[in-house]
Design a protein with these regions (language model features):
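Soluble metallo-hydrolase cores and metallopeptidase-like ectodomains found primarily
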Residues: 21-22, 111-136, 220, 225-304, ...
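Noncatalytic luminal/extracellular "stalk/propeptide" segments of secretory-pathway proteins
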Residues: 32, 41, 45-179
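N-terminal capping segment at the start of a domain
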Residues: 20-54, 80, 90, 218-228, ...
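N-terminal hydrophobic or amphipathic helices/low-complexity stretches enriched
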Residues: 17-59, 66-74, 160, 279-283, ...
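N-terminal signal peptide c-region/cleavage motif recognized by signal peptidases
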Residues: 13-15
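His/Asp/Glu-rich mid-to-C-terminal helical/loop segments that flank catalytic regions of hydrolases
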Residues: 234-238, 248, 319, 439-511
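Metal-dependent peptidase/peptidase-like ectodomains
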Residues: 100, 116, 121, 140-144, ...
């Protein structure tokens, strides 16, 4: 008996030493041989933004598969749907009267082009109306004009700037005036009889030559760039400074004119993909640890923090694990999802198309929301998540975990990022939520989401965290519990909330 006990203790000691050595090697590789800056340059500077349906999205998928193959990691493209193919080329906007000035802005995603020589026209702003009849009467006068469809912002300074320098009375007055103006604008829009989605079509059908918008993101020099709703005329987003200048000129009767030359290509129907790569497990190859990050982006910037940084974390984690942990117990699979921005489509397609993998998944680690170090992990509503996630976190270096707050069992995410696709299917999927770094105002879906906003020290920290979590989840002797929490009562309805339901992806988009 003593002999057997000695053998068992020796095995535990050797196994523990082996784990410690592997973890040390993982941390050293992630720290001293980081490839993050180079990967970021190739993805963000050279390939650029990754709007679904664009050639750049396909180029990014091909780049990722080749990169994985160069590291000795088998990879493939998972075709899950089709999308409207489109390519942004260029936008040139100039004020030509009452003076000459180049304006700053761009066409929205999937916007139609102008003709080769562009279009020059006067501008009009949305009128104050009492009802739909008045608005329809106004529409008769927009033929041959650009229509400025968004509210003129009362200030181009973000609230934090006001709070720092304004008197309290001035700050409060500005906020009240802005709130009153916003409420009046929305009420007026309702009186037109159209919504934010349908009013573009009404303006286009009335003969306008283009729509000018300005979706300010409440920060210096930042606008959010989404998609056009027009079919034949361009939709152009102007930065706040130029938009409000033109708006004032219209109000004061200065009759400004602008010239717009916007170029883009319609590419028909194109396939959409996920990039999948895996390090095959040696003991339990049919059980999976999944690393998750959406690959697509909006295209106002280059998609650096949404979600270039999440992509980089998962790619670098796979590189490090392949180098220092090439024979994992369980298969470690990475998914770079397409079309997250249009509704988690890529990850929902994966969950739907690979039910066996989903059924045998140990854990999913997802990273999406920005460049900052991870500061929050919650248990996603899984009752026993505390037991295994906390155990895994204990092996992460303290200088990484000291920033992290955990909450268990947490609550299941119904949307927001790709972890929700797995949670809905009952898989323990954890979002590695990061520090803000002014994400929502300055980089989330904006024209300023670019390489220079990345905090590489924080991203390196996230690689270490993700690599250690993946290693520990792979090595764990036990399979994770999927027992769910009892859902709480909704305070508004008085009814018990339900677990999020699995949804099918949109497999034909923009058509």
């Amino acid at each position: 008996m003593k002999k057997y006990l000695s053998i068992i203790l020796l095995f535990i000691t050797i196994n523990s030493f082996g784990q410690t050595e592997t973890l040390e090697n993982i941390i050293k590789e992630a720290t001293e041989n980081s490839q993050l800056e180079h990967l970021a340059h190739e993805l963000l500077d050279v390939i650029g933004p990754r709007l679904v349906g664009t050639p750049q999205m396909k180029t990014a998928h091909d780049w990722a598969t080749k990169k994985y193959e160069s590291w000795g990691i088998p990879s493939k493209l998972h075709k899950w749907g089709e999308w409207r193919g489109w390519e942004r080329i260029s936008t040139q906007i100039d004020m030509v009267s009452p003076r000459n000035r180049s304006l700053t802005g761009m066409q929205l995603a999937w916007s139609p082009s102008t003709k080769k020589k562009g279009v020059t026209a006067e501008l009009d702003v949305m009128p104050e109306v009492s009802n739909k009849e008045e608005f329809d009467l106004w529409l008769q006068g927009v033929k041959g004009k650009f229509v400025m469809k968004d509210m003129k912002q009362p200030t181009g300074r973000p609230d934090y700037n006001w709070e720092e320098f304004a008197t309290p009375e001035s700050f409060e007055k500005m906020k009240k005036d802005r709130d009153d103006q916003t409420r009046a604008w929305r009420a007026n829009l309702r009186k037109t009889g159209y919504g934010r989605g349908s009013i573009d079509k009404a303006i286009e059908d009335a003969g306008a030559v283009g729509i000018i918008s300005s979706n300010w993101s409440r920060g210096f020099g930042v606008n959010k760039i989404f998609s056009a709703r027009t079919k034949n005329i361009p939709t152009i987003d102007l930065e706040l400074e130029d938009y409000t200048m033109l708006y004032r000129m219209v109000e004061y009767g200065d009759n400004p004119k602008i010239k717009v030359i916007s170029k883009s290509k319609e590419l028909g129907v194109v396939p959409t993909f996920n990039t999948i790569a895996e390090i095959r497990g040696v003991e339990k190859p049919e059980e999976y640890v999944i690393l998750s990050a959406h690959f697509d982006s909006w295209d106002g910037g280059t998609g650096a923090t949404d979600n270039g940084t999440g992509t980089l974390v998962m790619m670098e984690t796979m590189r490090v694990l392949k180098a220092m942990y090439p024979n994992p117990k369980r298969t470690i699979l990475v998914g770079h999802w397409g079309s997250e921005e249009q509704g988690l489509n890529g990850s929902r397609a994966f969950v739907e198309d690979f039910p066996k993998i989903v059924e045998n998944t140990q854990a999913v680690f997802n990273q999406d929301n920005g460049t900052g170090r991870v500061v929050n992990i919650n248990g996603a509503g899984f009752l026993h998540s505390y037991e295994y996630v906390s155990r895994w976190l204990n092996s992460v270096p303290n200088d990484v975990t000291k920033h992290i707050e955990t909450s268990f069992p947490g609550s299941p995410s119904g949307g927001g990022s790709d972890n929700a696709s797995f949670v809905a299917a009952g898989v323990p999927a954890f979002n590695l939520s990061s520090l803000n770094w002014s994400y929502w105002n300055y980089t989330w879906h904006t024209n300023r989401d670019t390489y220079d906003k990345i905090i590489f020290d924080d991203v390196r920290s996230n690689v270490i965290l993700t690599a250690v979590l993946a290693y520990m989840a792979s090595e764990d002797d036990s399979k994770t519990s999927r027992e769910r929490m009892i859902m709480p009562i909704d305070s508004r309805s008085g009814k018990q909330r339900t677990w999020p339901t699995q949804r099918s992806p949109q497999r034909k988009g923009g058509l």
